[in-house]
Amino acid sequence: MQKSITSFFKKKSDDTDSPSPPKKIPKIDRKAELPDEPTIKAENGSPEVKPKAERMSVSPEEKTKNAPKSVKEETVATTDRKVTTIGLNSTAKDSKVDVENYDPSTDSYHPLKHAYWQDKKVTPYLALARTFQVIEETKGRLKMIDTLSNFFCSVMLVSPSDLVPSVYLSINQLAPAYEGLELGVAETTLMKAICKATGRNLAHIKSQTHLIGDLGIVAEQSRVSQRMMFQPAPLNVRDVFKKLRDIAKISGQSKMDLVYNMFVACRSSEARFFIRSLIGKLRIGIAEQSLLTALAIALVKKNHIDDCKASKVPDVYKDEIAETTLLLKTAYSQCPNYDIIIPAILEYDIKELQERCPMHPGMPLRPMLAQPTKGVHEVFERFGGMHITCEWKYDGERAQIHRNEKGEISIFSRNSENNTAKYPDLIARSKGFLKGEVESYIIDSEIVAWDVERKQILPFQVLSTRKRKNVDIEEIKVQVCVYIFDLLYINGKALVTKNLSERRKLLLEHFQEVEGEWKFATALDTNDIDEVQQFLEESVKGNCEGLMVKTLDEEATYEIAKRSRNWLKLKKDYISNVGDSLDLVVIGGYKGKGRRTGTYGGFLLACYDTENEEYQTICKIGTGFTDEDLQVHSEFLGKHVVSSAKSYYRYDPSLEPDHWFEPVQVWEIKCADLSLSPIHRAAIGIVDGERGISLRFPRFIRIRDDKNSENATDANQVAHMYQSQDQVKNNQKTSTQMEMEDEFY
Amino acid sequence: MFEARLGQATILKKILDAIKDLLNEATFDCSDSGIQLQAMDNSHVSLVSLTLRSDGFDKFRCDRNLSMGMNLGSMAKILKCANNEDNVTMKAQDNADTVTIMFESANQEKVSDYEMKLMNLDQEHLGIPETDFSCVVRMPAMEFARICRDLAQFSESVVICCTKEGVKFSASGDVGTANIKLAQTGSVDKEEEAVIIEMQEPVTLTFACRYLNAFTKATPLSTQVQLSMCADVPLVVEYAIKDLGHIRYYLAPKIEDNET
């Protein structure tokens, strides 16, 4: 006899699809994350163990009553979604286990066998969400990258066309950075969608979000705690990506509806990461460099899928990984577009990558950055015996100006943002400085504000008052002049592998100066220390920040990933104790006492470790603020309080502040010197295994609105500043050459 | 050819009011046994099932089975144009892409008809199995609506706990907690005011207030409401429509977590 208890809701259409539906074990899916199982089910009698919390104890008396009683009622239960995809019977069981336990971080992970979506060839979003979840719980950077590479490897092997969306979703981008396509969904909109989908109240969600500090988690909890009548079809990576792009492009009510419809289909941790993607913060600590490394490792794993276990690959094929990573990073720095790179790595040999992904005008390449020095002496120490050139370091905005064969001009910022719309005046007069036949070019330059009457450079603050968008050429008040200092591409030829002296020669051949509009950066080729010193003083008089020092012939190419010899910058304030000020992130606040009651009295500052992608404490600070400053900081930071330290903050418990902040603001800080500290964690492991570096007598200088927290001073730079102190140098004779990648001004 | 005629437009109005908050659009499945509608709300948390038997209509004719996808908002607009006492007739040709709704005043002096475009909705049809419920509670519909409305002020979810003694609705939130207990009525004088509990096993389940309050929009249709519950199974809230059929709402329970 068919017991009513074992029945459950099912799609009527299923009956026709599957002539004899196998007996399924109905059960309510507590986590709503089994894509292939009945989600809701009927009553007792099922072999499933009922969650105890949900049942009240049943007295024997009641039990006996139970049997004869028959209030025949229909009940609801749901069934499997697509009969055609995953089988309902035994395979359903297997896949269920795989889905729930999908874990690309295990040592035994096999990119093929454990890719449970093999037969479908469509990467489920849940697999990606699971990967993110595991990565979020992982501490070590290498392990995180390895986990991601396992997932990527599976995608490459099983569903390669999903690799592009998977990669974009992993770094939470919708398109190459320079296209500037951003989601921009307000948190309240998301909250409303969550309310609608789970029957909750907006006020409750708001207060819970405030408490937990992450709408993603709130969304997941809300999702998981409300069962559904019928689970919509599982999401897959490419649809999610496509929908996110749609969401970014539309506005108004329909945006909210799209979010809502997607959210309804989210299960378990999908809800968390979907919402985080929409907010714009994935919080898994994977950024561009880690991602490229993970891709490289995945490629190597793919090549050696039969040779050995995936977990062994990183050890056995170390060299191949290093080589692949370099090739990939090189290609990415000249062609920062995954839409081009990823199909290329899937189709061609990695060694051909550079030819397959050439640079071309209209697509920004990563700019060469400079590292700070303390003085002329240090420059000569570092560049000893090489031919060098010094250029004035203009105080303006870095600009990469592109012109393609069709004559279209685009202008990109230091961070590869498209600034073309900001400078219609430059585009209007862009013909003037060409000399001879120039069809296409990429130049590297600095745009500075220009006083037309007095013919002189104006400070950066003037430039920053220019409108950013919808600039009307008639209404421009701040005139600009472009100082060109490098040429990276001319008439279809990339010049990045040429030396600076050659590039400069070509620059002078093809371009000419136009007074007040286009100028070449004032330069001096000299190896005389006194001349450099004098040139520096001249540059300061010429309203410049200082000098940029570059090698002319040796290691003088423009290849970022290959680590061409870095440029150095010499700044006018190098005379102070520490060569440069530090730009540090405020991550915590201590409540003020006495006169400072009601505001924060001190703050906890951190530098950013780009390798580990974490913030490491470097000092507490309480001086250099006026009362007004404190008021302003307290108000601003008060809006960014989070309930607990971020997982990517490294600090000693003894430093626990009263309030933790989101890493939202960067301050310029000066200090007397740097010393090793048992409690601070800056650059820990670089200079000393146990101790970090801290600042002595830090003073607040100003807020660096132009930098975001990830552009703060890097741990390597801190280590380098520490080591280049005379005192330290005398102690340890063999100072290691620190390699620094990031700029620091 | 499909044709269905009801003596009073007011019933159809009330039915529309009872479902249009949950559903934006739905398919009316017509056969010679009557009209069926079954649809989940957008969030897939609740399900509405409406049955109108052919014998409840003044006139009912359905030559071939017909599925009519309708925008319920538009349908409600059309019904607003009817007087409560009007006769109402729904008509459609086989394979038509429109439905005609006609109102006739009681004295036959005014006849208005409205033609509405149909939609092609590919909604999932769910088979609803029969279940032995642990608890079935019958109570006055007004009372249930009142309880849901009151408790929603305290929390976003309501706990319904049914035991031998009676049924208890409770909610707790920032303000505090609210408990409403109903005992089984001793002697039944007026059937519509009775609270009747049939229980085999005690049940405690948690539901989102938002949906319960949406269900109570059906209160004008019926004096009594029937709640059927069983652990881990959706709640069924049924309103009988006198002589015509019933409307049932299914609601997936919430998973109680310890924090709330």
From Swiss-Prot, chain B:
GO terms for cellular component: chromatin; cytoplasm; nuclear replication fork; nucleus; PCNA complex. PROSITE patterns: PCNA_1, PCNA_2. One of its GO terms (biological process) is nucleotide-excision repair. Its main location: nucleus. Coiled coil: none annotated. The keyword Transferase does not apply. Expressed at high levels in adult ovary. Transmembrane segments: none annotated. It is found in: Nucleus; Chromosome; Cytoplasm. Keywords: Chromosome, Cytoplasm, DNA replication, DNA-binding, Nucleus. GO terms for molecular function: chromatin binding; DNA binding; DNA polymerase processivity factor activity. Disruption phenotype: Mutant flies show temperature-sensitive lethality, hypersensitivity to DNA-damaging agents such as ionizing radiation and methyl methanesulfonate, suppression of position-effect variegation and female sterility. Residues 61-80 bind DNA. Pfam families: PCNA_C (PF02747), PCNA_N (PF00705). Homotrimer. Forms a complex with activator 1 heteropentamer in the presence of ATP. Interacts with E2f. Interacts with the catalytic subunits of two DNA polymerase complexes: PolD1 from the delta complex and PolE1/DNApol-epsilon255 from the epsilon complex. Likely to be an auxiliary protein of DNA polymerase delta complex and is probably involved in the control of DNA replication and repair by increasing the polymerase's processibility. Belongs to the PCNA family. NCBIfam families: pcna. HAMAP family: DNApol_clamp_arch. This is Proliferating cell nuclear antigen.
